[in-house]
Protein backbone atom coordinates (compact mmCIF):
# COMPACT_ATOMS: atom_id res chain seq x y z
CA UNK A 1 0.00 0.00 0.00
CA UNK A 2 1.41 3.44 -0.85
CA UNK A 3 2.60 5.51 2.10
CA UNK A 4 0.36 8.36 3.27
CA UNK A 5 1.43 11.85 2.28
CA UNK A 6 0.85 12.83 5.93
CA UNK A 7 3.51 10.43 7.24
CA UNK A 8 6.92 11.48 8.53
CA UNK A 9 8.47 9.54 5.65
CA UNK A 10 6.74 11.98 3.28
CA UNK A 11 8.80 14.76 4.86
CA UNK A 12 11.96 12.75 4.43
CA UNK A 13 10.96 11.94 0.86
CA UNK A 14 10.64 15.66 0.15
CA UNK A 15 14.28 16.06 1.22
CA UNK A 16 15.51 13.56 -1.37
CA UNK A 17 17.17 15.89 -3.81
CA UNK A 18 20.75 16.20 -5.00
CA UNK A 19 23.89 14.14 -4.69
CA UNK A 20 23.42 10.67 -3.16
CA UNK A 21 26.70 8.96 -2.23
CA UNK A 22 26.98 5.23 -1.54
CA UNK A 23 29.70 4.53 1.05
CA UNK A 24 31.31 1.30 2.18
CA UNK A 25 34.65 -0.46 2.10
CA UNK A 26 37.37 0.05 4.68
CA UNK A 27 36.28 3.41 6.10
CA UNK A 28 32.68 4.35 5.30
CA UNK A 29 32.64 6.98 8.04
CA UNK A 30 35.53 8.90 6.48
CA UNK A 31 33.88 8.56 3.08
CA UNK A 32 30.62 9.91 4.44
CA UNK A 33 32.40 12.78 6.18
CA UNK A 34 33.96 13.87 2.90
CA UNK A 35 30.73 13.47 0.94
CA UNK A 36 28.65 15.39 3.47
CA UNK A 37 31.36 18.04 3.71
CA UNK A 38 31.03 18.52 -0.02
CA UNK A 39 27.27 18.93 0.18
CA UNK A 40 25.89 15.45 -0.50
CA UNK A 41 22.19 15.33 0.37
CA UNK A 42 21.95 11.59 1.05
CA UNK A 43 24.29 8.81 2.16
CA UNK A 44 23.62 5.12 1.63
CA UNK A 45 25.62 2.83 3.92
CA UNK A 46 26.48 -0.27 1.91
CA UNK A 47 28.80 -2.62 3.81
CA UNK A 48 28.00 -5.90 2.08
CA UNK A 49 30.33 -8.28 3.91
CA UNK A 50 30.59 -6.51 7.26
CA UNK A 51 29.19 -7.91 10.52
CA UNK A 52 25.89 -6.43 11.60
CA UNK A 53 27.51 -4.74 14.58
CA UNK A 54 30.01 -2.95 12.37
CA UNK A 55 27.24 -1.72 10.07
CA UNK A 56 25.25 -0.50 13.06
CA UNK A 57 28.23 1.36 14.56
CA UNK A 58 29.21 2.95 11.25
CA UNK A 59 25.64 4.03 10.56
CA UNK A 60 25.33 5.68 13.96
CA UNK A 61 28.58 7.55 13.46
CA UNK A 62 27.50 8.69 10.01
CA UNK A 63 24.15 9.83 11.40
CA UNK A 64 26.00 12.03 13.88
CA UNK A 65 27.85 13.66 10.97
CA UNK A 66 24.72 14.00 8.86
CA UNK A 67 22.30 15.59 11.33
CA UNK A 68 20.56 18.48 9.62
CA UNK A 69 22.67 18.02 6.49
CA UNK A 70 21.93 14.72 4.77
CA UNK A 71 19.61 11.74 4.88
CA UNK A 72 21.17 8.39 5.84
CA UNK A 73 19.85 5.10 4.49
CA UNK A 74 21.12 1.59 5.17
CA UNK A 75 21.56 -0.87 2.33
CA UNK A 76 19.60 -4.13 2.60
CA UNK A 77 19.08 -4.24 6.37
CA UNK A 78 15.79 -2.73 7.52
CA UNK A 79 16.45 -4.03 11.03
CA UNK A 80 19.76 -2.18 11.29
CA UNK A 81 18.23 0.99 9.86
CA UNK A 82 15.61 0.88 12.59
CA UNK A 83 18.11 0.15 15.37
CA UNK A 84 20.49 2.88 14.24
CA UNK A 85 17.78 5.50 13.92
CA UNK A 86 18.54 5.98 10.22
CA UNK A 87 16.24 7.74 7.80
CA UNK A 88 15.45 4.57 5.90
CA UNK A 89 16.56 1.51 3.98
CA UNK A 90 17.38 0.72 0.38
CA UNK A 91 16.31 -2.71 -0.86
CA UNK A 92 17.72 -4.73 -3.73
CA UNK A 93 16.50 -7.81 -5.53
CA UNK A 94 17.55 -10.26 -2.81
CA UNK A 95 16.41 -8.26 0.21
CA UNK A 96 13.18 -8.11 2.16
CA UNK A 97 10.08 -7.47 0.04
CA UNK A 98 8.94 -3.87 0.28
CA UNK A 99 5.74 -4.69 2.23
CA UNK A 100 7.72 -6.59 4.87
CA UNK A 101 10.25 -3.79 5.24
CA UNK A 102 7.40 -1.30 5.57
CA UNK A 103 5.76 -3.46 8.23
CA UNK A 104 9.02 -3.51 10.19
CA UNK A 105 9.86 0.17 9.77
CA UNK A 106 6.37 1.63 10.02
CA UNK A 107 5.24 4.72 8.14
CA UNK A 108 7.99 7.09 9.23
CA UNK A 109 11.16 5.71 7.63
CA UNK A 110 11.99 5.75 3.95
CA UNK A 111 11.89 2.55 1.93
CA UNK A 112 13.68 2.66 -1.42
CA UNK A 113 13.81 -0.12 -3.99
CA UNK A 114 16.16 -0.90 -6.87
CA UNK A 115 14.32 -0.99 -10.22
CA UNK A 116 15.34 -1.33 -13.84
CA UNK A 117 12.08 -0.70 -15.70
CA UNK A 118 9.08 1.57 -15.39
CA UNK A 119 6.93 -1.46 -14.60
CA UNK A 120 9.21 -2.48 -11.72
CA UNK A 121 9.19 1.09 -10.42
CA UNK A 122 5.41 1.30 -10.46
CA UNK A 123 5.17 -2.05 -8.69
CA UNK A 124 7.60 -0.93 -5.97
CA UNK A 125 5.56 2.20 -5.27
CA UNK A 126 2.33 0.21 -5.21
CA UNK A 127 3.88 -2.07 -2.58
CA UNK A 128 4.73 0.88 -0.35
CA UNK A 129 8.13 2.18 -1.43
CA UNK A 130 8.70 5.92 -0.98
CA UNK A 131 11.15 6.23 -3.85
CA UNK A 132 12.95 4.10 -6.40
CA UNK A 133 16.49 3.70 -7.57
CA UNK A 134 16.46 3.48 -11.35
CA UNK A 135 19.26 2.41 -13.63
CA UNK A 136 21.83 1.79 -14.71
CA UNK A 137 21.69 5.08 -16.58
CA UNK A 138 25.18 4.72 -18.05
CA UNK A 139 27.81 1.99 -18.01
CA UNK A 140 28.86 1.50 -14.38
CA UNK A 141 32.22 2.72 -13.14
CA UNK A 142 32.32 0.18 -10.30
CA UNK A 143 30.73 -3.14 -11.33
CA UNK A 144 29.47 -5.30 -14.16
CA UNK A 145 25.90 -4.56 -15.23
CA UNK A 146 23.07 -7.12 -15.21
CA UNK A 147 21.21 -5.14 -17.88
CA UNK A 148 22.17 -2.64 -20.61
CA UNK A 149 22.37 1.05 -19.66
CA UNK A 150 18.97 2.74 -19.77
CA UNK A 151 20.07 6.20 -20.85
CA UNK A 152 18.68 9.66 -20.23
CA UNK A 153 15.56 9.33 -22.36
CA UNK A 154 14.35 6.33 -20.35
CA UNK A 155 15.19 8.13 -17.11
CA UNK A 156 13.10 11.11 -18.20
CA UNK A 157 10.19 8.82 -19.06
CA UNK A 158 10.30 7.16 -15.64
CA UNK A 159 10.65 10.47 -13.79
CA UNK A 160 7.64 11.91 -15.64
CA UNK A 161 5.52 8.83 -15.03
CA UNK A 162 6.09 8.39 -11.30
CA UNK A 163 4.58 10.42 -8.45
CA UNK A 164 7.67 9.80 -6.30
CA UNK A 165 11.39 10.60 -6.30
CA UNK A 166 13.65 8.73 -8.70
CA UNK A 167 17.26 8.15 -7.66
CA UNK A 168 19.29 7.70 -10.84
CA UNK A 169 22.24 5.33 -10.58
CA UNK A 170 24.89 3.81 -12.79
CA UNK A 171 28.00 5.38 -14.28
CA UNK A 172 27.11 8.97 -13.39
CA UNK A 173 30.08 11.33 -13.41
CA UNK A 174 30.68 15.05 -13.25
CA UNK A 175 30.09 15.44 -16.98
CA UNK A 176 26.72 13.66 -16.74
CA UNK A 177 25.17 14.81 -13.49
CA UNK A 178 23.56 18.02 -14.76
CA UNK A 179 21.89 16.10 -17.57
CA UNK A 180 20.61 13.55 -15.04
CA UNK A 181 19.03 16.38 -13.05
CA UNK A 182 17.53 17.92 -16.19
CA UNK A 183 15.99 14.54 -17.03
CA UNK A 184 13.99 14.73 -13.81
CA UNK A 185 15.93 12.62 -11.32
CA UNK A 186 15.53 13.68 -7.70
CA UNK A 187 19.00 12.38 -6.88
CA UNK A 188 22.13 11.19 -8.64
CA UNK A 189 23.65 8.19 -6.85
CA UNK A 190 27.40 7.79 -7.20
CA UNK A 191 30.33 5.87 -5.81
CA UNK A 192 33.54 6.23 -7.83
CA UNK A 193 32.81 9.72 -9.12
CA UNK A 194 33.23 11.00 -5.56
CA UNK A 195 35.02 8.32 -3.55
CA UNK A 196 37.50 7.50 -6.31
CA UNK A 197 38.59 11.13 -6.63
CA UNK A 198 41.85 12.45 -5.21
CA UNK A 199 39.81 14.89 -3.11
CA UNK A 200 36.38 13.33 -2.44
CA UNK A 201 35.02 16.36 -0.63
CA UNK A 202 35.87 18.66 -3.51
CA UNK A 203 34.47 16.13 -5.99
CA UNK A 204 31.22 15.98 -4.04
CA UNK A 205 30.98 19.77 -4.02
CA UNK A 206 31.46 19.94 -7.79
CA UNK A 207 28.87 17.24 -8.42
CA UNK A 208 26.31 18.79 -6.08
CA UNK A 209 26.78 22.18 -7.75
CA UNK A 210 26.41 20.63 -11.20
CA UNK A 211 23.28 18.76 -10.13
CA UNK A 212 21.73 21.96 -8.79
CA UNK A 213 22.56 23.75 -12.04
CA UNK A 214 20.86 21.00 -14.01
CA UNK A 215 17.83 21.08 -11.76
CA UNK A 216 17.58 24.86 -12.10
CA UNK A 217 17.77 24.49 -15.87
CA UNK A 218 14.68 22.29 -15.87
CA UNK A 219 12.84 24.87 -13.80
CA UNK A 220 12.74 23.11 -10.43
CA UNK A 221 13.22 24.92 -7.16
CA UNK A 222 16.44 23.82 -5.43
UniProtKB/Swiss-Prot annotation:
Pathway annotation from the record: Cofactor biosynthesis; thiamine diphosphate biosynthesis; thiamine phosphate from 4-amino-2-methyl-5-diphosphomethylpyrimidine and 4-methyl-5-(2-phosphoethyl)-thiazole: step 1/1
GO cellular component: cytoplasm
Binding site for Mg(2+): 76, 95
Disulfide partners: none
Name of a matching Pfam family: TMP-TENI
Catalytic class of the enzyme: transferase
InterPro entries: Aldolase_TIM, ThiamineP_synth_sf, ThiamineP_synth_TenI, TMP_synthase
Primary role: Condenses 4-methyl-5-(beta-hydroxyethyl)thiazole monophosphate (THZ-P) and 2-methyl-4-amino-5-hydroxymethyl pyrimidine pyrophosphate (HMP-PP) to form thiamine monophosphate (TMP).
The family this protein is said to belong to: Belongs to the thiamine-phosphate synthase family.
UniProt name for this protein: Thiamine-phosphate synthase
Organismal lineage: Bacteria, Pseudomonadati, Myxococcota, Myxococcia, Myxococcales
Name of the gene this protein is made from: thiE
Amino acid sequence: MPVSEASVSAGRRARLGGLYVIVGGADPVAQARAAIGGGARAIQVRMKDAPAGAVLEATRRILALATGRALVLVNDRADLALLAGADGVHLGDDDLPVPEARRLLGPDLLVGRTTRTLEEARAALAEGADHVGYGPIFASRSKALPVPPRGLAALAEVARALPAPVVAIGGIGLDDVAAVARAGAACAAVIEAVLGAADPEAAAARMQAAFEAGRAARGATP
